UniProtKB/Swiss-Prot annotation:
This is Elongation factor 4. CDD domains: EF4_II (cd03699), EF4_III (cd16260), LepA (cd01890), lepA_C (cd03709). One of its GO terms (biological process) is positive regulation of translation. Keywords: Cell membrane, GTP-binding, Hydrolase, Membrane, Nucleotide-binding, Protein biosynthesis. Its EC number is 3.6.5.n1. GO terms for molecular function: GTP binding; GTPase activity; ribosome binding; translation elongation factor activity. Belongs to the TRAFAC class translation factor GTPase superfamily. Classic translation factor GTPase family. LepA subfamily. The gene is lepA.
Amino acid sequence: MNLEELKKRQGKIRNFSIIAHIDHGKSTLADRILEKTETVSSREMQAQLLDSMDLERERGITIKLNAIELNYTAKDGETYIFHLIDTPGHVDFTYEVSRSLAACEGAILVVDAAQGIEAQTLANVYLALDNDLEIMPIINKIDLPAADPERVRTEIEDVIGLDASEAVLASAKAGIGIEEILEQIVEKVPAPTGDVTAPLKALIFDSVYDAYRGVILQVRVMDGVVKPGDKIQLMSNSKTFDVAEVGIFTPKAVGRDFLATGDVGYIAASIKTVQDTRVGDTVTLATNPAAEPLHGYKQMNPMVFAGLYPIESNKYNDLREALEKLQLNDASLQFEPETSQALGFGFRCGFLGLLHMDVIQERLEREFNIDLIMTAPSVIYKVNLTDGESMDVSNPSEFPDPTKIATIEEPYVKAQIMVPQEFVGAVMELAQRKRGDFVTMDYIDDNRVNVIYQIPLAEIVFDFFDKLKSSTRGYASFDYELSEYRPSKLVKMDILLNGDKVDALSFIVHKDFAYERGKLIVDKLKKIIPRQQFEVPIQAAIGHKIVARTDIKALRKNVLAKCYGGDVSRKRKLLEKQKAGKKRMKSIGSVEVPQEAFLSVLSMDEE
């Protein structure tokens, strides 16, 4: 293609993504757009086509982003090239959303006609506005009996401040309004602005590992052109590779002769190791490099940490490889090796949130076949020592001696909870119980309220989300962002079995709740740990002070069964002998801790 044609083609490209709260019909809308533009033949069509991971289909959520090229012939007779970049809607995957948005010029905002705006919708809209995207509101599910498009229209205008007068009323399920949406994309989404003649700059927004071709980069070309045979250079580490193949996704990978400015596609350059590529890096040509990289994504910092240990210790290396492969297309997963006396060798992993943690654990168990034990999740605490030093600690077993600690600060998040009016009381009670501080609340419409609290992240990490859903019959939606660190009265609680600390069961707790938390745990462990041949005390301790204790009674054989009648001293001798045996056993015996014991520390408030 000559320059003229490339520039003309660039004017026909539209890059957009779809943003929505969970279950507002984002993946279904993507399906309809694929069908309408005949990208996928009806034979290959299946619901939620872009959610290709089993886990995504089962949970009905989108986890990974996906990029597809479609051709659409508009009413003006021209054929346009659409790049649809599908994004997740869940709070833990915000970084996936920000990555998708960095590759786009426009965003379709899908809002459910019955439910209206939810917390996540807002969070994603703000991300889109940060990226200066053209936002097109669409009111979806208008075929539902409870749909009230006019109310939602005013909501979009009042709460977000977007002009919704031209918002398309659609039903992705019934296929209503799809054509209008496509026409609006052509009219409203701007064409890419890059320069074809400039040195190549392409943003890596994802990467996947292929056993045959190495690491395959998914890129959005911002400036210039890339084709097979070029020598590319990664700007973060200056490594160079030879391009073997470039192409696009129509969900399947299809090879192309080149990728030019505005294109979204993949580059295969036989990159062998996972560590060479970072999502958010800039690809340029080694022969004619760009002067400076694109500003990538802000590095996502993990907020939740937990230990992952293989149940079979010989699977340790498999677990490392699996984590490396997951890290390849999940840049926010961090891990480092750690050992525990109770669990052996494993990794300390950092996650963005609980759903992220859950999904990673499931992917490890499914895709890589590794059975795992996971320790209680914790957050990063700032510990200020008496000698003026300060340290960041995410693992309870690394906490310094209590006598050396001056103060401990913990992270607080600003939580936005959107909830129908009748549940406001329940939500406030829950937030108070989780040590939350009330900030403000405002009414979105006659019925829905946005309540804002400052809550310690450590309290949210446990089971806040489940509790919120159950106390509001599932109507609340919830979004949080890290706000600040505050000093708190925190203590580290150790659990002792038979006098020995079990490092994997230690956790950090607020001083005011320490006693009841300790009592709860020892009672719970008593039910779970099987009885031994000797008595096992279970203790909860803060430093050297025991705050709760319970004993697992010993199993004992009736040694007097063979003494029909007989002298009392004979009986006493047998009992003393048994007692001495038990004592000896106790001094050398070790207690097996079953898997459930570690999990019981997680699910604290179920009683």
